[in-house]
Amino acid sequence: MGQKRDEQVSEDQGPPREPYNQWLADTMEEIKEEARKHFPLIILNAVSEYCVQNTGSEEEACEKFITLMNRAIWVHLAQGCDGTFRERRPQLPPSGFRPRGDRL
């Protein structure tokens, strides 16, 4: 009763795992595919650029991107997204239109 047992995980417990780099690449593709359904490409590019600029390695940038986009998608869906993104095209100004400061 007073003896302390060391707990050890058996070596053959569970299926073999894929290498971390492969898991990271697969997860990146999955999260990007899902994110494209809900957010404009300009947002995804900005998040990606932020991750690259604020981490020390490509692996860390991928991890950060996955974390941020996972949270963003979760919040987006929790707020009632119907599951599709419809990108709006920017409206072009009427032909012959010139901005006010552009008088020649």
Swiss-Prot record:
Stated name of the protein: Protein Vpr
Subcellular location: Virion; Host nucleus
InterPro entries assigned to the protein according to its UniProt record, in alphabetical order: Lentiviral_Vpx_assoc_factor, RetroV_VpR/X
KW Cell cycle (keyword) present: yes
Subunit structure comment from the entry: Interacts with human UNG.
The entry's keywords: Activator, AIDS, Cell cycle, Host nucleus, Host-virus interaction, Transcription, Transcription regulation, Viral penetration into host nucleus, Virion, Virus entry into host cell
Functional description taken from the UniProt entry: Stimulates gene expression driven by the HIV-2 LTR. Prevents infected cells from undergoing mitosis and proliferating, by inducing arrest or delay in the G2 phase of the cell cycle. Cell cycle arrest creates a favorable environment for maximizing viral expression and production.
Miscellaneous note of the record: This is an African mandrill isolate.
GO biological process, one term: viral penetration into host nucleus
UniProt region (Disordered), positions on chain: 1-21, 85-104
Gene3D superfamilies given in the database record: 1.20.5.4730
The keyword Transcription regulation is annotated on this UniProt entry: yes
Gene that specifies this protein: vpr
A Pfam family assignment: VPR
GO CC list: host cell; host cell nucleus; virion component
